Amino acid sequence: MSAGRPGPNVGGELSLATFNTHLGVDGWGRPYDVVAACRSLDADVLVLQESWAPDGSPSLARRVADDLGYDLVEEPLGQGRLLGPDPGADDRWGPSLGPLSTILHVDDDPRWRQRRSGARRSGGRHGSWGLAVLVRVPARFLGVTRLRPLRRDPVRRLVLSWEVPVGNGVLTVHGTHVSHLLQGSPVHYRELSRALAPGGRPAVLAGDMNLWGPAVSLQLPGWRRVVRGRTWPATRPHSQLDHVLVSGFVTGSGAVLGPLGSDHRPVRAELVVDDAPPGGAAGGTTAPGTTAPGGGGHGTAR
């Protein structure tokens, strides 16, 4: 870890936040300050979804890590062209609560290419977007668990896992961004249930699950919801799509926070790792489909 960052969590507590950044823009394509938004979360661990990286430039997650002093692992999930701000924008967050296709054209997806011909504006910048997990406390990156491609989802899906010493134990931290239900997410939930089977060890799973809380609980037995509250759409939320789940000897509390510029509200939790019996700490064993550090060179850790 770099000098000046917080040391080990000797008190047995860890703060974590998950935030879907919506590529760092509102529904009209107008940028907001993602670094300031993440600074306000003040979390030891940040799970960021839809982190935009223009070709040849640092990603939003990298900028957050560099400015706020985090270590970072990130993986691209898709590529496309992010359009510039809509000249017809008004004071609303966006023109609708529709898909990202209003501001983003996804590569290798015929449905989105068809929409391109009728787009209200052109131009923009090509790049990629993905998932990132950032830590500002001592930690060890465990690997990447890749989920199988779904025919109706043009975006890759995966899990990034870290091991964080907390108090006298070790907490395994998983960050993810799951497909939408209409794209076949139950397939991925079955994979997650097998690959991340709790087994009694302290762990947390956080991210945009694209699914309501009760359904998430049914899909992931053994995981408990820490925060309950509506997260989407950020302006007038009616559903909770963003979750923090724990298993093993972990308790916690938290809240859904106010809007920070995205269409999702962030979720922040304070987690406590209780003393576990001998042998109950999480180990470094990787799950099936997992790339260990250095095994594929896809994640970047400083």
Question: What does each of the following model-derived ranges do?
Answer:
Residues 1-45, 53-56, 67, 71-302:
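Active-site regions of metal-assisted phosphoester/phosphodiester hydrolases
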Residues 62:
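Active-site phosphate/pyrophosphate- and oxyanion-stabilizing loops and adjacent acidic/basic residues
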